[in-house]
């Protein structure tokens, strides 16, 4: 009987040891599971934080790009306005001068009339003074007469109305000026009507 008691005691001790081992394994597994769970949670949080940081960087880049584009657009608009303002200032008299060209033509025709009387000569003298004054004002605004006779024909500033033949001159040379042409700064207001050598 004593032997049996020892065996029972040993068996109970074995059971306690086995249960202790099982509990220890279970506890170890639970600790490992919680550590894995924490790692998963950390990695998910890290991923979220990384995604948030990446999206924030993209947003900052987009905002900076938008700011740079707006700045460039503003600079371009200001430059365009400045160029438009300069062009408007440079050519402000264009419309008025275009309207005055027929007046200048009429003054020139009036000055070509030959007079025999003293009274008519004084009127012509007055017309000439007005013409010169008007011409000075137009030159002050930048109006220039286009040179034509003896020049090579240039379709940008000359308008060929007829062709004539002169063997002493080169082909394409302007022989006669039929109506004066004018340039304002660098724009042609009216091309010169010319006769060109064949």
Curated annotation (Swiss-Prot):
InterPro entries per record: GrpE (IPR000740), GrpE_coiled_coil (IPR013805), GrpE_head (IPR009012)
Disulfide bridge positions per record: none
A single GO BP: protein folding
UniProtKB keywords: Chaperone, Cytoplasm, Stress response
GO molecular function: adenyl-nucleotide exchange factor activity; protein homodimerization activity; protein-folding chaperone binding; unfolded protein binding
Domain of life: Bacteria
Cytoplasm listed as a keyword: yes
The UniProt record lists the keyword Cytoplasm: yes
UniProt feature coiled coil, ranges: none
GO cellular component, as recorded: cytoplasm
Gene3D superfamilies according to UniProt: 3.90.20.20, Head domain of nucleotide exchange factor GrpE
Cellular localisation: Cytoplasm
NCBIfam families named in the record: PRK14140.1
Subunit relationships: Homodimer.
Family: Belongs to the GrpE family.
UniProt function note: Participates actively in the response to hyperosmotic and heat shock by preventing the aggregation of stress-denatured proteins, in association with DnaK and GrpE. It is the nucleotide exchange factor for DnaK and may function as a thermosensor. Unfolded proteins bind initially to DnaJ; upon interaction with the DnaJ-bound protein, DnaK hydrolyzes its bound ATP, resulting in the formation of a stable complex. GrpE releases ADP from DnaK; ATP binding to DnaK triggers the release of the substrate protein, thus completing the reaction cycle.
Protein name: Protein GrpE
Organism: Lysinibacillus sphaericus (Bacillus sphaericus)
Gene: grpE
């Amino acid at each position: 009987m004593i032997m049996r008691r020892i065996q029972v005691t040993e068996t109970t001790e074995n059971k306690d040891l086995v249960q202790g081992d099982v509990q220890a394994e279970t506890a170890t597994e639970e600790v490992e599971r919680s550590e894995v769970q924490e790692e998963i949670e950390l990695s998910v949080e890290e991923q979220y934080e990384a995604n948030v940081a990446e999206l924030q960087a993209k947003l900052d880049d987009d905002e900076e790009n938008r700011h740079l584009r707006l700045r460039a657009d503003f600079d371009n608009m200001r430059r365009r306005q400045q160029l438009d303002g300069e062009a408007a200032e440079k050519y402000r008299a264009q419309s008025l001068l275009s309207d005055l060209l027929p007046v200048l033509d009429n003054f020139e025709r009036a000055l070509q009339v030959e007079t025999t009387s003293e009274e008519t000569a004084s009127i012509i003298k007055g017309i000439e003074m007005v013409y010169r004054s008007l011409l000075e004002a137009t030159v002050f605004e930048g109006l220039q007469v286009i040179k034509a006779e003896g020049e090579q024909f240039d379709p940008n500033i000359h308008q060929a109305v007829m062709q004539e033949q002169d063997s002493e001159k080169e082909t394409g040379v302007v022989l006669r000026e039929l109506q004066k042409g004018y340039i304002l700064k660098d724009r042609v207001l009216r091309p010169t009507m010319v006769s060109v050598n064949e």
